[in-house]
C-alpha cells in the first residue's frame, strides 16, 4: 500500500493531465527536459484535445496533444480570430502554452500550435475531466480512439471515478435498506416473512428480466462500436445468466421450504429473545459497517494509485508520457486478495464478538442478573487472546474463494471456444468449489463459538465444534438451516434492490463508462453490508445451537445438573421432528459434570 501511494499519482486519474506532464487543477512540479511542465494549473481544470475530431490511435509512444483549459468551448469556433476571442473573454487558451493569445492570428506557427479548425463544441465530462465533443460524428471518433486505446484497468478506474457520486448514493441507500432489514428481523412475524419471500421472488424475477432486456437492447443497438459498450454487453449477458440460475435455485428452495415458515418464525423469535438479554448487540453492525467503509475507501484509493503508477519520460517536442512501472500493474490481483481477506477478517471479528457475548449470557444461571458489559468483555477477549483465531478463520475463507475467482477467469476464456467438454468440466469444478467454500463458513462460525466457550485455538475449537455438532446433527442441522435460509433471503432482497437502483442509475451514461464494473462493485458492497447487519442473527442462531449441544452433553435437566438453556428454547427444540431420538442419544453420550454449574471443555 505504501509503495503504491508513493509510486502512484491518483491525481492524474482524478483530475486529468496534459501532454506536458501537468495535472489539471493542481500546482505542478517541473519535469526535467520538459520546458512546458511545472505550471500552475489551479484554475485550469479541464483537459482539452487540440484535434478532437481527428484523433489517431497512439503511435511512436505519443498520444494526442492535450492541454489544460479553464473552460471548454461550448460553441463551434471556425477561425483563429474566434479562438482568440474565446481566450480573451473566457480566459481559456486553446493553443499551446508557449504561444501568447495575442499571436494566435499573427504567428506563422499558429497552425501547428493551435487546434485544427473548426473547433467542435464540447462540454466537460467527469471521465478524466475531459472536454467531450458534442457533434455526433466527432464524438464517435473521439470516444472510439480514446476509450478503445486505453487499457482495461484504466477503463475500469475511469468508470468508477465517473460514477463515484452514483456509487456513494447507492451505498447510502444500501446502508438504509440494511438497517431497515435488521429491524424487520428484530420484530419478525409470519406476515413479515411472507412479505420478505414475496419481495425476494418479485425482485429476482424483475432484476433478471431487466438484465435480459438490457442485453437485448445492447445487441440490437447499431451504434455499439466502442470496446466499453461491447464489454458492457458481455457483462450484461453474464449478469443475466447468473441471475437466472440464482433465481431458479432460490425459487426451488423457497418452494421446498414453504411449509416451514411457521417453524422459522418461531425460531427467529427465540433468537430475538436471546438478543433481548444483550440488546446492544444490534449496534455492533454499525461499528463493523463504519470500519468496512473506511477500509473500502482506503482500498479504492490504493487501487487508483496502482493504476497510475508510472515514471515520466520526455518525448520529442517536450511532451511527457507516463510509462507504467514493470510488474506493479499486475499487483491488482494481490490487492484483490487483500480486499477479500481483510473484509472477512473484519466480519470475523464481529462474529467472534457476538458469539462471545451470547456465550456469556447463555451460561448464566441467574437470568434476572445478566452479566455486566458482555460485549466489551467479548471484545477484550478477542483482541487479547483470539486475534490469531480470527486471522486463521478469515484466511481459510479467502483461500477457498480464490480458486473460484481463478476458475471464473479461466471459464471466461474457455467459453469463447466451441468445445463443450472443457466448459462442462469447468462448470462441475466450479460447483464443487462452491460447496467447498460454504462448508468452511459454517465450520468457522461454530469454531468461533467454541473458542468463546473453551478459550482454545482455532483448529482445536473447529474440531471440538465439529464433534459436538455431529452428535446432535439430527435436530440441530435441520432446524438451523431454515432460519439461516430466511436470513439469506433478507440479504438477497437488499442486493436485488441495490442492483436495480444501480441499473437505473448507471444505464444513463453507458456509452462513456465501463459501468458493469461499478455495478458489480455496488452489488458486492450491498451483499457485504447486508451480511454485516444480518449476520448478527446468524451468529446468535449458530451460537445458541452450539451452546444447546454443549448443555445437553454436560447436563441432564435434573435438580443436580439443571440446564442452562431457556425453557422456551427447550420447548421449541422439543417440537421439532427429530428431537426425541437426538435427546436419547444426548443422554447416552453425556459427559459427567458433578455440579452442573461449571462449564467444562466440549470434548474430552
Curated annotation (Swiss-Prot):
Transmembrane segments: 165-185, 195-215, 237-257, 286-306, 330-350, 485-505, 514-534
One MF term in the entry's GO annotations: transmembrane transporter activity
Membrane topology: Multi-pass membrane protein
Keyword Transmembrane on entry: yes
Major location (coarse): membrane
Keywords in alphabetical order: Glycoprotein, Membrane, Transmembrane, Transmembrane helix
Entries under Pfam families matching the protein: Choline_transpo
Glycosylation sites per record: 90, 103, 454, 472
GO biological process: transmembrane transport
Protein name: Choline transporter-like protein 3
Species this chain originates from: Rattus norvegicus (Rat)
GN (gene name): Slc44a3
Amino acid at each position: 500500500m505504501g509503495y503504491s501511494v508513493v509510486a502512484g499519482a491518483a491525481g492524474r486519474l482524478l483530475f486529468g493531465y496534459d501532454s506536458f506532464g501537468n495535472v489539471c487543477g493542481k500546482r505542478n512540479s517541473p519535469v526535467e527536459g520538459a520546458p512546458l511542465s511545472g505550471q500552475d494549473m489551479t484554475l485550469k481544470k479541464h483537459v482539452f484535445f487540440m484535434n478532437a475530431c481527428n484523433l489517431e490511435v497512439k503511435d511512436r509512444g505519443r498520444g494526442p496533444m492535450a492541454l489544460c483549459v479553464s473552460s471548454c468551448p461550448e460553441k463551434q469556433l471556425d477561425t483563429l480570430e474566434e479562438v482568440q476571442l474565446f481566450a480573451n473573454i473566457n480566459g481559456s487558451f486553446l493553443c499551446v502554452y508557449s504561444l501568447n493569445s495575442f499571436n494566435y492570428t499573427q504567428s506563422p506557427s499558429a497552425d501547428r500550435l493551435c487546434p485544427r479548425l473548426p473547433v467542435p463544441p464540447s462540454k466537460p465530462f467527469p471521465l478524466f475531466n475531459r472536454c467531450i465533443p458534442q457533434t455526433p460524428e466527432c464524438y464517435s471518433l473521439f470516444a472510439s480512439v480514446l476509450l478503445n486505446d486505453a487499457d482495461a484497468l484504466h477503463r475500469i478506474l475511469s468508470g468508477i471515478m465517473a460514477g463515484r457520486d452514483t456509487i456513494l448514493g447507492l451505498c447510502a441507500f444500501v446502508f438504509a435498506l440494511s438497517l431497515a432489514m435488521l429491524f424487520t428481523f428484530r420484530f419478525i412475524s409470519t406476515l413479515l416473512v411472507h412479505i420478505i419471500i414475496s419481495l425476494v421472488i418479485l425482485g429476482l424475477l424483475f432484476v433478471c428480466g431487466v438484465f435480459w432486456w438490457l442485453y437485448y437492447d445492447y445487441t440490437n443497438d447499431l451504434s455499439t462500436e466502442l470496446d466499453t459498450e461491447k464489454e458492457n454487453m458481455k457483462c450484461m449477458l453474464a449478469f443475466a445468466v447468473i441471475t437466472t440460475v440464482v433465481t431458479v435455485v432460490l425459487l426451488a428452495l423457497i418452494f421446498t421450504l414453504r411449509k416451514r415458515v411457521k417453524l422459522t418464525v418461531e425460531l427467529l423469535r427465540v433468537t430475538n429473545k436471546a438478543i433481548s438479554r444483550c440488546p446492544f448487540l444490534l449496534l455492533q453492525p454499525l461499528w463493523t459497517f463504519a470500519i468496512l467503509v473506511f477500509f473500502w475507501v482506503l482500498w479504492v484509493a490504493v487501487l487508483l494509485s496502482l493504476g497510475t503508477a508510472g515514471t515520466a519520460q520526455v518525448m520529442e517536442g517536450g511532451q511527457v508520457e507516463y510509462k507504467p512501472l514493470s510488474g506493479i500493474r499486475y499487483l491488482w490481483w494481490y490487492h484483490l486478495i487483500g480486499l477479500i481477506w481483510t473484509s472477512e477478517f473484519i466480519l470475523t471479528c464481529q462474529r467472534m464478538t457476538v458469539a462471545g457475548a451470547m456465550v456469556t449470557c447463555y451460561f448464566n444461571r441467574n437470568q434476572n442478573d445478566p452479566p455486566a458489559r458482555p460485549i466489551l468483555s467479548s471484545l477484550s477477549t478477542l483482541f487479547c487472546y483470539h486475534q490469531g483465531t480470527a486471522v486463521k478463520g478469515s484466511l481459510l475463507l479467502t483461500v477457498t474463494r480464490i480458486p473460484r475467482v481463478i476458475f471464473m477467469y479461466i471459464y471466461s476464456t474457455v467459453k469463447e471456444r466451441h468445445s463443450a467438454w472443457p466448459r462442462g468440466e469447468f462448470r462441475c469444478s466450479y460447483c464443487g468449489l462452491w460447496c467447498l467454500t460454504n462448508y468452511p463458513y459454517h465450520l468457522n462460525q461454530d469454531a468461533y463459538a467454541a473458542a468463546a466457550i473453551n478459550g482454545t485455538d482455532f483448529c482445536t475449537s473447529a474440531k471440538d465444534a465439529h464433534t459436538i455438532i455431529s452428535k446432535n446433527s439430527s435436530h440441530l442441522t435441520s432446524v438451523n438451516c431454515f432460519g439461516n435460509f430466511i436470513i439469506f433471503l433478507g440479504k438477497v432482497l437488499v442486493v436485488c434492490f441495490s442492483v436495480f437502483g444501480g441499473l437505473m442509475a448507471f444505464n444513463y451514461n453507458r456509452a462513456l463508462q465501463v459501468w458493469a464494473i461499478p455495478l458489480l462493485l455496488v452489488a458486492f458492497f450491498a451483499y457485504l453490508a447486508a451480511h454485516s447487519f444480518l449476520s448478527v442473527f446468524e451468529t446468535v442462531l449458530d451460537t445458541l445451537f452450539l451452546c444447546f449441544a454443549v448443555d445437553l452433553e454436560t447436563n441432564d435437566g435434573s435438580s443436580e445438573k439443571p440446564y442452562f438453556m431457556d425453557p422456551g428454547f427447550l420447548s421449541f427444540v422439543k417440537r421439532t421432528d427429530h428431537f426425541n431420538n437426538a435427546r436419547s442419544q444426548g443422554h447416552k453420550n453425556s459427559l459427567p459434570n458433578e455440579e452442573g454449574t461449571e462449564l467444562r471443555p466440549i470434548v474430552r
